[in-house]
Amino acid sequence: MDLCEESETFLENKENKKIEDAEETALTFHCPDERSERNHVCCLLGVSELTLEEDGRASEFTISTGWEEAVHGWGRTSPTACIWSKKKVRRGRVGEGTSGGSNCLFCMSLSQGSLEPRPLSAAGKLEEAAVAEVSSQKNWGSEKNWNSPSQGPASREPNKLCFPTYLHGEKKSLQMKEFIWCMEEWGIPEAVSSKACRNPSSSTDQGLSISDAVATKALVVLPPLKSSSHNLDSLSKKSRNIFWQPEEKVLGVEKDECMACPDELKGVDGKGEKAHFELASRLKVTNILPFPPTVTRTHLLSAESQRCCLHWSLLPQKSSVFPPNPTNIHYLATLQVLGQQGGQNCRTRLKAKEAKPPRTTPKHIVTEAKQESRPHVLESKVFPKPLLPSLTVSRVVIPVSTHRVL
């Protein structure tokens, strides 16, 4: 009996040992060290960071609402993206404005203060009032009659404000104003002006054509120079009839003056009348001719063209009839200085060392020389109005609300 009890206790102890060994091996298999636990936690943290990055990339393409989200997400979205409001804006009627068609706060703020659609009959009155306002704001010295009956409606087109005309069923665009100011008159052909005078602007089709014409003329920098050639020819003909002298007389005067004073200034008699005549004849040849081939006049024209920025072929080509001579240029400069100082300085400084035989001159030439003894200044009549460009200024005003967009 004792042997049987010992064997049973031995077997029970073995089984208990096996169970304890199995539990210890299971514990050591699941968590053998602390390093494995740390590695497992690091893997979980890495997965969470990856998910956060993916969520952030997905939110970059969404347009956020609110002021802070708009400021933070402005670099993520395009600069032309619209900020949409959460509240539902009521739908407007057709042709009422841009607020009914879209709920964009930025577009709604731009469209505030725009013109309401008005009939075409009232548009003409608005244009006339705008012409009066523009003419009152100008501070130029030119006094012109913009609303004179001689000018047709086509000539007053550049002075009007371009108010947009809306048709039925068409939505209103942003407020756009075009201020077109003209210092000089536009060169309009006679056929167009006669047609404009015969057909007054009363129908709706002509109102639309006026706005189109203003829009096309806003792109033109310089007016057409069609009437400039006629005025230039008439000016040259008048100047030839009044001031032109034959080449023989001019050459004779130059020869006499060069023979009289080759090195220094040589006066004539002590009376001073012939000195006045020489001074006036030289100034008449140099300063009064429309386009002479001398040095002083071309210098004035080049300075005037550089001041006005006129890149046209106004200056004539150099001709070989009058070759430049340094003695003549020096003599001209001294004569101009003498003409400015007066007749007394002419008598004192133009004293001859060698006597010169008196020459007979007609009386009417002497009287003209006395009247024109002063140097002739370049007048503005040399350049007619069609040659000068008219200044056009086009400006587009888009009103933006100053309040913060929410």
From Swiss-Prot:
Matching entries from InterPro entries are given as: DUF4529
Which stretches does the entry tag as region Disordered?
Answer: 136-157
Task: Tell me the first and last residues of the signal peptide.
Answer: none
Q: What is the protein's given name?
A: Uncharacterized protein C16orf46 homolog
Which residue stretches does the UniProt record annotate as biased composition, category Polar residues?
136-153
What PANTHER family does this protein's entry cite?
CHROMOSOME 16 OPEN READING FRAME 46
Q: Name one GO cellular component term.
A: cytosol
